Amino acid sequence: MKLTAEELLWDWCRQGWRYRGIGNQPRAAQDWYEARIRYEMELIVSKGFADFILFTSDAIRWGKDQGIPFGPGRGSTAASVVAYHTRITEIDPFKYQGMLFERFIDVSRSDPPDIDVDCSDERRDDVYNYLAYKYGAECVGHIGNFVRYRGKNSLVDTARVYNVPKWAKETVSNLIVERSGGDARFDESLADTAEMFPNARDVFDQFPDLWQALRLEGNVRGMSIHAAGLVVSSTPITDICAVYERNGVRVLALDKYDAEYAGLLKLDFLGLSTMGMIARFLEMTGLTLADLYAIPDDDKETIDVFRRGDVVGIFQFEGRAAKQVNRDVYPAHFLHLADINALARPGPLLAGITAEYCDVRHGRRQATHLHPMVDEFTRDTYGQIVYQEQILRILKDMAGFDWFSVGQIRRVISKKLGEASFQKSYQDFIDGCENTSGVSKEVADKIWKRIVTSGTYSFNIAHAISYSMLGFWTAWMKCHHPLEFYAASLAKADNAEARYRLMKDALGHDIQVVPPILNASRCTWRPSESLGLIAGWEQIPGIGAKTAAKIDEMRWGEEGGKFRAWSDLEAIPGIGPKTVEKMGVFATAHDPFGLHTTEKTMKKVRNFLRKQKQVPKPTHTGAQLADIVMQNNESHRFVKGPRVIYAGIAKSLNLQDVIENRRSRSGQTEEEILKTLKRPDLLEFCSIRCYDETDEEVYVRVNRFQFPKLRRTVGNIALNHDVIVVVGNRIAGFGTPVMVDQIYIIDPD
């Protein structure tokens, strides 16, 4: 008998009840699950979303049954018990009751909810092929994505068209700087580069045609494949829009907004490299997805990884802000990790919420009390409104808003529509608090101001829990299976700096990092109990994945065998005597991965500084700067710390603009921002990321008052080569920042 979508979804929920072992839980818990499922199902069915839930669940369940690693959840989907029972998520809402289902689906919603899913980047195509097989290849496709010109590709295209010499193009390309805080389309801008670096300007003046590249920046260059979006149609997609094929992959000539407008069913399956790393880890250890999903979130040894600050390679926790907030919070349990995820963002950091959370948590101050109901909703976050769900609960329970009205506020928060959009509900909130909870207008007004301020940066707790769970898994791997963790992480690290950090961290954990071994290496990194981390053939410069696979087959394949000498590799097509010689030199080098280069450079520079008198001698290393404890004053403005002199290798330069920075955070106009500035003629400032032999990142900041004086000096720094000696003050903030007023450049050669 054919079941309706509603009947089938109920059946899958009953299967999920058994799969999750709900029947083995206490009666009170079972009653809670049953009531929640009935409530959610009523809303899902009434909105016509049952088919969508079934469709999504089917694809994810198939993937999990095939051993494809999927993340525990993403976004507000994790708040749904139905999603948990149908195996869309692995987060139990009963365990984390701060999550709100209404954040996922509310009564005012007419369009299907967003269900974003993370899966292994190496097997995402398997999910696509399953959908194509089940629904027909002509009905399945990838969403397109508009690609815009940025500094480097506009430079490359312009140089090619006007036959500009390669050396000129590379001179400018190597000087392109980041610009954060503004429109992402104009990050890594050529205009910034030409303004900042005299030698870049010289190239532009020598080859005037290159100025055309500036006109391309920000314009559409073409289309690519969206990183996550898949669509399924009930009719051939070519009946709806144009489709083009690239390498056998069908791509719509629509972006995600146009695809939704056309009525196509959209799935967001993001191929996440962390999930790919986990897939490799499971293969190396022989563990299964079930083992991964069963990791207890109260594992003390894993929590200790975070308490030690041992977060290199840990998903969502190794960034400079998260690293600093993790250190300040000093987590005691899993939910503290979710709080760190939410607090390590510009909004709460700049608003002082992160600092106040830490102060209250460690008993340095009392939480601000506005009303007992607000205290109840913020008890677990030390009196701070950190999450969107806390705001929604205040609106619902304290002000008596119905879910339709709460849903409208939810959209204002999630779409970041700004304070003006909040004000439409101000009077309703004031009246609602008085009529529902007997709260005076004065107190309600204070609560409202707190809501409006928090609403501009508050985070989704379901997403914070989901991604903290993924971070917890990676920390568990690092703690209990370190060899396999490092090998899998190195195999998936997508840039040289990430690989360097992982290798240095492995050495710090007494795990050796060895170059390729003729008869022991595979294509990429592999763990060895006796030797440590053995590099693969792909780690040798000039050896690509295809060549590495041929070497691997020759050594480990059915017809393969041990190599007698490096010269045996010459039997492989594409590998000649010179290549073999280079491979042998790399494999026998003293420091093939450059793990001691920074140490050698800094030792050489420090010896030079001790012998001369023109440049101040450093007083602190990066690690010593990080250990300086910074205090906050009552207004949460960071006070200036001690005077310091620091020396480190300049790695990257980030140029920023006050107008762009504030406008992106506050929504204020340029005129409004300029009125608040002292010296509105000074707008630019910059940050230089540095390392020394302690491998502690230090952010050298040049404020807008000092920038005009130091602009030329900053422009003369050769990144990834020069050592800079800076004089300034240690200041508080994420990372290890130093506000400087003097910069000296040392050429280590």
Please place each PLM-identified region on the residue numbering.
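Noncatalytic, beta-rich nucleic-acid-contacting surfaces in large DNA/RNA-processing enzymes
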Residues: 1-749
